[in-house]
């Protein structure tokens, strides 16, 4: 299924990083904070004034957007104003 964001929205896929304690114990998802880093999957046609393209990594507001599930994968539909930064690695 393909989802195309409307207006000034983007479809992003959160990047989940495995968290371990100093002792090497892997923390379950319920003990971790929400991810704030994501990959841009689709961009709405009205998104302007930001230098972001599909495939870029971004930092977004912690509780922004609407979480959706597509083909058993987690995504977020988010307003362009909730994108805080572009990550360059």
Curated annotation (Swiss-Prot):
Subcellular location: Cytoplasm
Subcellular location, principal: cytoplasm
Keywords: Chaperone, Cytoplasm
Entry GO MF terms: ATP binding; metal ion binding; protein folding chaperone; protein-folding chaperone binding; unfolded protein binding
SMART domains per UniProt: Cpn10
GO (cellular component) term, any one: cytoplasm
PROSITE patterns: CHAPERONINS_CPN10
GO biological process: chaperone cofactor-dependent protein refolding
CDD domains from the UniProt entry: cpn10
Domain of life: Bacteria
Family membership noted in the UniProt record: Belongs to the GroES chaperonin family.
Quaternary organization: Heptamer of 7 subunits arranged in a ring. Interacts with the chaperonin GroEL.
Biological function: Together with the chaperonin GroEL, plays an essential role in assisting protein folding. The GroEL-GroES system forms a nano-cage that allows encapsulation of the non-native substrate proteins and provides a physical environment optimized to promote and accelerate protein folding. GroES binds to the apical surface of the GroEL ring, thereby capping the opening of the GroEL channel.
Name of protein: Co-chaperonin GroES
Species name: Kosmotoga olearia (strain ATCC BAA-1733 / DSM 21960 / TBF 19.5.1)
Source lineage: Bacteria, Thermotogati, Thermotogota, Thermotogae, Kosmotogales
């Amino acid at each position: 299924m393909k989802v195309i964001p409307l207006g000034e929205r983007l479809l992003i896929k959160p990047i989940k990083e495995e968290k371990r304690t100093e002792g090497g114990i892997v923390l379950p998802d319920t003990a971790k904070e929400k991810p704030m880093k994501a990959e841009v999957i689709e961009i709405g046609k009205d998104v302007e004034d930001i230098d972001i393209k599909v495939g870029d990594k971004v930092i977004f507001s912690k509780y922004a957007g609407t979480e959706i599930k597509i083909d058993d994968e987690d995504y977020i539909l988010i307003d362009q104003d909730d994108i805080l930064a572009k990550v360059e690695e």
